[in-house]
């Protein structure tokens, strides 16, 4: 079993990184709302990696569920154009670390340094659509596709990352999720009832930005964003307006003066016709008339790279049964531990649940394991209490400490199996 001594602590931007000695040379490369990302060297594989620390994943049930979702997606989605999970571990402080390939830069940074030549625009768009074809075939929507979520290495290999916002293809989806410039109009117009087509819109915006070197729809706010979209596409058609669910949004849209669309060939005069044709098929107001990733791959513009024998789909749909679950933190904790153990092919531990079982069965097993841990903690705390001298303040302090330690030992005993792999796999 891994001990605290098997992990090395270091401060990065005031944040404690607690990793095994397999990983060295930590340098910060990015900071998100829920985690810090560092580059590092994997001394076992002899290659650079990115390590994302999920801070306090078990502090709330919402954060625990979000982390569980991201882990499940990273385990399920395995494709050349998606960032792939190489390692995952739980530190003694119960932070979770995801280890993935390290790409040299992202598309956002690349676009700020120089304009892209035609062949790079083609190749990057091809890889984006190739990745989306796979993601969508798995029943997953990225929802936050933007240049900073598209990673590129020195060989121009492209990988889509950050599936933290990814969701099921669900007929009733709500909320603002994607960065405004790349947000599909159906998200702005309805805030629900959207599908995989939102990713195609985002990819179209990225395509235009790669072509022109600047964002196509740089909206200052929600209203301005919609306005500059209609500057190009014209007013939304009636069948799109009829899908608007928000009464206020409907009043706003119908109050606007009618606008005629600008022909794409006039707006993009310096762009080759085949590129303009594909872009026009991606940026369509009606999501049901928007081209799919699979169809876009066979478009003549991408002919130099299209290979129907090497554009795979997912082996199975992603299981979203957990998505509506409202579970306590300790249940999510046990399920997370089991996923980590499963990733490292470690089995046979006490209470370990079968990650291939139905979600309901997993929840039942995880709930039982968490309840058992709590019962053990309570029994051990009571035993300490009975054997202590209640009149001694030092004993009272010892008793409280023993109870805390007992509870911690009980609930983390299950999870220590997840830490255990450090001995077997990281040396």
UniProtKB/Swiss-Prot annotation:
Post-translational modification: Dually phosphorylated on Thr-174 and Tyr-176, which activates the enzyme. Phosphorylated during osmotic stress.
Gene: HOG1
Keyword Transport: no
Family: Belongs to the protein kinase superfamily. Ser/Thr protein kinase family. MAP kinase subfamily. HOG1 sub-subfamily.
UniProt name for this protein: Mitogen-activated protein kinase HOG1
CDD domains linked: STKc_Sty1_Hog1
Span list, region Disordered: 380-409
TXY (motif): residue ranges: 174-176
Main location per the UniProt record: cytoplasm
InterPro entries, per database record: Kinase-like_dom_sf, MAP_kinase, MAP_kinase_CS, MAPK_p38-like, MAPK_Sty1/Hog1, Prot_kinase_dom, Protein_kinase_ATP_BS, Ser/Thr_kinase_AS
Record field: catalytic activity: L-seryl-[protein] + ATP = O-phospho-L-seryl-[protein] + ADP + H(+); L-threonyl-[protein] + ATP = O-phospho-L-threonyl-[protein] + ADP + H(+)
Superkingdom of source: Eukaryota
Phosphotyrosine modifications at: 176
Entry EC number(s): 2.7.11.24
Occurrences of domain Protein kinase (ranges): 23-302
Lipid biosynthesis as UniProt keyword: no
UniProtKB keywords: Activator, ATP-binding, Cytoplasm, Kinase, Nucleotide-binding, Nucleus, Phosphoprotein, Serine/threonine-protein kinase, Transcription, Transcription regulation, Transferase
A GO molecular-function annotation: ATP binding
Residues forming the catalytic site: 144 (proton acceptor)
Activity regulation as described: Activated by tyrosine and threonine phosphorylation.
Enzyme class, broadest EC rank: transferase
Notes on the domains: The TXY motif contains the threonine and tyrosine residues whose phosphorylation activates the MAP kinases.
Gene Ontology annotations for the cellular component aspect, listed alphabetically: cytoplasm; nucleus
């Amino acid at each position: 079993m891994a001990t605290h001594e098997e992990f090395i602590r270091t401060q990065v931007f005031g944040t404690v990184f607690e990793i095994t000695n397999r990983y060295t040379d930590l340098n910060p490369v990015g900071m998100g709302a829920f985690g810090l990302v560092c580059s590092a060297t994997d001394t076992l594989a002899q290659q650079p990696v990115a390590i994302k620390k999920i801070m306090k994943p078990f502090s709330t049930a919402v954060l625990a569920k979000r982390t569980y979702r991201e882990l499940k997606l990273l385990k399920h989605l395995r494709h050349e154009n998606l960032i792939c999970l190489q390692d995952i571990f739980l530190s003694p402080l119960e932070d979770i670390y995801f280890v993935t390939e390290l790409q040299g830069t992202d598309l956002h940074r690349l676009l700020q340094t120089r304009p892209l030549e035609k062949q790079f625009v083609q190749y990057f768009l091809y890889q984006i659509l190739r990745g989306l074809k796979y993601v969508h075939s798995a029943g997953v929507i990225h929802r936050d596709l933007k240049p900073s979520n598209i990673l590129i290495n020195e060989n121009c290999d492209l990988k889509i990352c950050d599936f933290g916002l990814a969701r099921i293809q669900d007929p009733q989806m709500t909320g603002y999720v994607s960065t405004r410039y790349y947000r599909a109009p159906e998200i702005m117009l309805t805030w629900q009832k959207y599908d995989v087509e939102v990713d195609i819109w985002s990819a179209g915006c990225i395509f235009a930005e790669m072509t022109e070197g600047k964002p196509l729809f740089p909206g200052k706010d929600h209203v301005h964003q919609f306005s500059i979209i209609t500057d190009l596409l014209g007013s939304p058609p009636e069948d799109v307006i009829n899908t608007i669910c928000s009464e206020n949004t409907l009043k706003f849209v119908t109050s606007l003066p009618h606008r005629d669309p600008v022909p794409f060939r006039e707006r993009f005069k310096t762009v080759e016709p085949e590129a303009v044709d594909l872009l026009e098929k991606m940026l369509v107001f009606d999501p049901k008339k928007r081209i799919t990733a699979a169809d876009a791959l066979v478009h003549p513009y991408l002919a130099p790279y299209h290979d129907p024998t090497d554009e795979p789909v997912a082996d199975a749909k992603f299981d979203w049964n957990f998505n509506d679950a409202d579970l306590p933190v300790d249940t999510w904790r046990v399920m997370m531990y089991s996923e980590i153990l499963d990733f490292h092919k470690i089995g046979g531990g006490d209470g370990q649940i079968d990650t291939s079982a139905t979600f309901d069965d997993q929840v039942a097993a995880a709930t039982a394991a968490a309840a058992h841990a709590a019962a053990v903690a309570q029994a051990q705390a009571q035993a300490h209490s009975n054997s202590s001298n209640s009149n001694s303040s030092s004993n009272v302090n010892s008793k409280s400490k023993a109870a805390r330690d007992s509870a911690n030992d009980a609930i983390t005993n299950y999870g220590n199996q997840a830490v255990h792999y450090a001995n077997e796999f990281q040396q």
